[in-house]
Amino acid sequence: MQVSVETTQGLGRRVTITVAADIIESAVKSELVNAAKKVRIDGFRKGKVPMNVVAQRYGASVRQDVLGDLMQRNFVDAIIKEKINPVGAPNYTPGEYAVGGDFTYTVEFDVYPEVELKGLEAIEVEKPVVEVTDADVDTMLDTLRKQQATWKETDRAATAEDRATIDFTGSIDGEVFEGGKASDFVLAMGQSRMIPGFEDGIVGHKAGEEFTINVNFPEDYHAENLKGKAAQFVIVLKKVEERELPELTEEFIKRFGVADGSQEGLRAEVRKNMERELKGAVRNRVKTQVLDGLINANDIEVPVALIDGEIDVLRRQAAQRFGGNEKQALELPRELFEEQAKRRVVIGLLLGEVISSNELKADEARVNVLIEEMASAYEDPQEVIEFYSKNKELLNNMRNVALEEQAVETVLAKAKVVEKSVSFNELMNQTTTA
């Protein structure tokens, strides 16, 4: 076997392989001998068909199969010999071939980039230092009560915390626009569901009043014909309702899995959940900064085949989220996923090099901690832990998570880390908007 390797462009490679005629003929003869033992041809007993008859009947197809097999096997041998690391499916191109002669073919493919990590010491990371305070727990308890609140009609003026039932008609330059009119529309205030200024215009008015508010549609509004336009809304306020928060009774508290129904037990459970969320938020905040720094410090060429594969994964995930099928997933525009796919591939290559160069292996103790942390959010944590321990695929997925964490921590150990005190709400709001 003769092999030559050339670079086509960037990460592209072309391997040219020549297989000697005697290798081909030996393989063809061997396959014909095997075929002669199995084929059935009228006039001959099974296994007694003369070789010349077998060759005449099956020679062409056997030779074709042999050439296909030799192409694949010799390519594998070639890349092992040349220490080439291909990515994606190779593209085989057979050359001209005459029976009894040598066979030359080419294989084109991309290779993984050579990654040499640099700039780790220059990565800057701001690590949040956060404590869950009693005031944070109070705020979370208020949120839980609001989620379970009932509504009671009131005759006072509307506030930003109320629920309003309205009729409205919107117009631009005196013309009512499509989608700008509704009756008995129930609006929970303070959730920013409407365009800026709409809810503010309702505050201070009472049920039974009719009034007009002036607002501007945002420049990035989803409807093209309304972007940046000034509009007027005539509003009839039909009903104002205020929240009635439930008391922290034993019955109410038990809904949240606190067996003894005590306020102390509820506060302890809420604090535990908040601290678990906080730990994850801090970890993700630090991880994002580490990965951003790693990407910015290491500009690497990315194989198109890897990006294509990641785009397919993201397409299928998007289709599953919205109830679509695989065919619909493949029809989603590539541009929707290309940037995210490239980032994921780059992160994978860089962290892969961190893992390889530092000879990292998944820490089983860390794997167990990760499973326990995840399981603690379920009603029966032990059942979840046992389920993971018996599921090899899930266990390997968690090992990959642990290994990624270890790689991030390895980079973090070399980075410039500055601690910054922030409040629980500040950090969680940053996490939500990131």
Swiss-Prot record:
Q: Which organism does this sequence originate in? A: Pectobacterium atrosepticum (strain SCRI 1043 / ATCC BAA-672)
The top of its lineage is:
Bacteria, Pseudomonadati, Pseudomonadota, Gammaproteobacteria, Enterobacterales
Q: What does this protein do?
A: Involved in protein export. Acts as a chaperone by maintaining the newly synthesized protein in an open conformation. Functions as a peptidyl-prolyl cis-trans isomerase.
Q: Name one GO cellular component term.
A: cytoplasm
Q: Which UniProt keywords apply?
A: Cell cycle, Cell division, Chaperone, Cytoplasm, Isomerase, Rotamase
Tell me which residues make up the PPIase FKBP-type domain: 161-246
EC number(s) of the enzyme?
Answer: 5.2.1.8
Q: What is known of its domains?
A: Consists of 3 domains; the N-terminus binds the ribosome, the middle domain has PPIase activity, while the C-terminus has intrinsic chaperone activity on its own.
Q: Name one GO biological process term.
A: chaperone-mediated protein folding
Enumerate the PROSITE patterns for this protein: FKBP_PPIASE
This protein's source sits in the domain of life called: Bacteria
Q: Which molecular function GO terms apply here?
A: peptidyl-prolyl cis-trans isomerase activity; protein folding chaperone; ribosome binding
Q: Which Pfam families match?
A: FKBP_C (PF00254), Trigger_C (PF05698), Trigger_N (PF05697)
Recorded hits in SUPFAM superfamilies, A to Z, give: FKBP-like, Triger factor/SurA peptide-binding domain-like, Trigger factor ribosome-binding domain
Query: Any idea what this protein is called?
Result: Trigger factor
HAMAP family associated with the record:
Trigger_factor_Tig
What does the similarity note say? Belongs to the FKBP-type PPIase family. Tig subfamily.
| Compartment(s) where it occurs, according to its Swiss-Prot or TrEMBL record | Cytoplasm
Query: Sorted alphabetically, which PANTHER family does this protein's record hold?
Result: TRIGGER FACTOR CHAPERONE AND PEPTIDYL-PROLYL CIS/TRANS ISOMERASE, TRIGGER FACTOR-LIKE PROTEIN TIG, CHLOROPLASTIC
> Which reaction is this enzyme known to catalyze?
[protein]-peptidylproline (omega=180) = [protein]-peptidylproline (omega=0)
